[in-house]
Amino acid sequence: PLVADPRIAGVITRLLAVSGSAEQALTEIRALTRDAGIALDAPLAAMQARLAALQSLGVATDKISFAARFGRNMEYYTGFVFELWARDKEGPVQLAGGGRYDTLLEMLGANHPVTAIGCAIRTERVLAARRQQGGA
C-alpha cells in the first residue's frame, strides 16, 4: 500500500474529503488536525486571513468553495492555488486561475530563490460573464 499506517491513511482520506464553504472547510480541517495531532496552525491562519481580507473588500466569502482534493496541474505551484468560476447559460466557465510558485524561477535557472504569485485571467470570458449578468 502507498501508506502503510492505516491511521495515517485514514487522516489523509478524511482530509481529502473536506469540501464545502471555505469557512466550513477551515472548521473541519482544524478539528481533523487537532484530533490527529497535526500542527497546521500557520497555514490555517493564513487561509483565515485571506478570507478576512476578501470580506473587507466586500467579497461574499460564503460563496467561496474549498475542496481539499483541488490542485492545479502545473508542477511549479508551491502553495495556495485558486480558480475563479462563473456560471453562464451553458454552465460553469473558468474565468481565472493561478497561485503561488516560489521555485519556478530557480527551475528556470535563477541562482537564488524568488517568491512569486500569478494568475491567468481570461478577459473574453470575464467580459462575456459581465454582459450576461447585465453589466457593461
Where do the language-model regions lie?
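Positively charged, Gly/Ser-enriched RNA/tRNA-binding surfaces
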Residues: 1-136
